[in-house]
Amino acid sequence: MNIRIGHGFDVHKFGGDSPLVLGGVTVPYDSGLIAHSDGDVVLHAISDAILGAMALGDIGKHFPDTDANFAGADSRVLLKHCYQLALQKQFVLGNLDVTIIAQAPKMAPHIEAIRQCLSADLQTDIDNINVKATTTENLGFTGRKEGIAVEAVVLMKSQ
């Protein structure tokens, strides 16, 4: 069996009046995230991790923010496209580990819904999906509640 590891990282700034969507789940909060697409920073980091594991570049290459076709794009559609590229290379998700870095909103009430959404979108058992959240103890831009950062690591295995 061939295995590959991918790492993804993304950051978005709070702003605007669009809803806050994280991992495909709408999370109640004062503000959404500023982005060319729907701003789902969780799905962007995961998409980058999958593309990285497959040596296919990053989401900016596949969905450039200069392309009006992707304005307001549903990040679940983008994630599914990235996963399809892995499937075409005969790779499936072994496991996924996501860290959401945010002072606010509190993520604990939303973690299981995010895991369920990711499990469905990535066609894998929920036991292969881990999502956790941490703060930066009021330090840096996330600590000042200016935005959210996410790291994602995937293990992809050949079929």
From Swiss-Prot:
Co-factor(s): a divalent metal cation
A Gene Ontology molecular function term of the record: 2-C-methyl-D-erythritol 2,4-cyclodiphosphate synthase activity
InterPro entries hit by this protein: MECDP_synthase, MECDP_synthase_CS, MECDP_synthase_sf
Keywords, sorted A to Z: Isoprene biosynthesis, Lyase, Metal-binding
Site (Transition state stabilizer): H36, T135
Keyword match Metal-binding: yes
PROSITE patterns: ISPF
Role description: Involved in the biosynthesis of isopentenyl diphosphate (IPP) and dimethylallyl diphosphate (DMAPP), two major building blocks of isoprenoid compounds. Catalyzes the conversion of 4-diphosphocytidyl-2-C-methyl-D-erythritol 2-phosphate (CDP-ME2P) to 2-C-methyl-D-erythritol 2,4-cyclodiphosphate (ME-CPP) with a corresponding release of cytidine 5-monophosphate (CMP).
Name assigned to this protein: 2-C-methyl-D-erythritol 2,4-cyclodiphosphate synthase
